[in-house]
Curated annotation (Swiss-Prot):
Enzyme class, first EC level, given as a word: transferase
Signal peptide segment: none
Keyword list, A-Z: ATP-binding, Kinase, Magnesium, Metal-binding, Nucleotide-binding, Thiamine biosynthesis, Transferase
Protein's recorded name: Hydroxyethylthiazole kinase 2
Entry-linked InterPro entries: Hyethyz_kinase (IPR000417), Ribokinase-like (IPR029056)
E.C. numbers: 2.7.1.50
Single GO biological process annotation from the record: thiamine diphosphate biosynthetic process
Annotated positions binding substrate: 41, 193
UniProt-listed SUPFAM superfamilies: Ribokinase-like
Family: Belongs to the Thz kinase family.
Length: 267
């Protein structure tokens, strides 16, 4: 895609603060390391600002929310807003939890650089009909035409913010650009945490000076292309998980990986 430039090699080993869930934190940490940056996970309100102030990007994931974690998230998001720290918010579970949906809407006031979610989560957040259950998207929610128009309107309300919507076709929407991307494989749904990983990789690319739109396109494409390189015939879940992380560390050596992105960018 001509709109994107290769972010590798990573120019500086940025510290990425991930406020995420206990299920996927190891995968996120290893994924960030595979790209050449450093992860830290701190969600105790007593220390959260110490780590956020040292970081070059903040990733907030709402999985496994608690009252204490919510307090820490609000503290970190406020600091990110006041200090212009790039921030990604992953709206996990807003289709089911009114607490999470309310929190995400509050976090919009802190102007995250990227707001991420699956098709059902984002449809729920912007007030469209959805069929999401738990933290999973529904196959019934993959219609993009109505969602795209609403997101364009939201981008005018929240200038400078990009939306990253994951699905069979990934949507990235900003004030002036829309990308529809088509890389990936169904096997990524075999293991938990791959959606969370996209958010963490987005934070990595933000830490390198990419815009929200660029970082979102790079992150979702990088993971999807890495997964496409894996031969999955006869492969079990644990082997596939291992190979995903393995390919994340190898793909950055390919100077032409951007040429394998499938999709279009529209102005």
């Amino acid at each position: 895609m001509q709109a994107l430039t290769n972010p590798f090699p990573i120019g500086s080993s940025s510290l990425i603060h991930c406020m995420t869930n206990e299920i996927s934190c190891e995968m996120l940490a290893n994924g960030i390391l595979a790209l050449g940056c450093k992860p830290v996970m701190a969600d105790d309100p007593r220390e959260v600002l110490d780590f956020t102030k040292q970081s070059q990007a903040l990733f907030i994931n709402l999985g496994h929310l608690s009252a204490e974690k919510e307090k820490a998230i609000r503290m970190a998001a406020l600091y990110a807003n006041q200090s212009s720290l790039p921030m990604v918010v992953d709206a996990v579970g807003v289709t089911t939890s009114s607490i999470r949906k309310s929190l995400v809407k509050d976090l919009l006031d802190y102007r995250p650089t990227v707001l991420k979610g699956n098709m059902s989560e984002i449809r729920s957040l912007v007030g469209l009909k959805h069929h999401g259950v738990g933290v999973d998207a529904s196959a019934k929610d993959q219609e993009t035409e109505d969602l795209l128009q609403v997101l364009k309107d939201w981008c005018q309300t929240y200038p400078g913010m990009s939306f990253l919507v994951t699905g069979p076709k990934d949507l990235i929407v900003s004030e002036n650009q829309v990308a529809v991307l088509e890389n990936g494989c169904a096997e990524l749904d075999w293991i938990t945490g791959t959606g969370d990983l996209v958010g963490a990789l987005t934070a990595v690319f933000l830490s390198q000076g990419k815009t929200g739109f660029e970082a979102s396109c790079l992150a979702v494409s990088y993971l999807n292309i890495a997964a496409e390189k894996i031969v999955v015939q006869g492969m079990g879940l644990e082997e596939f998980r291992y190979q995903v992380l393995n390919q994340l560390s190898l793909l950055r050596r390919d100077e032409n990986w951007l040429d394998t992105i499938k999709g279009e960018v529209y102005e």
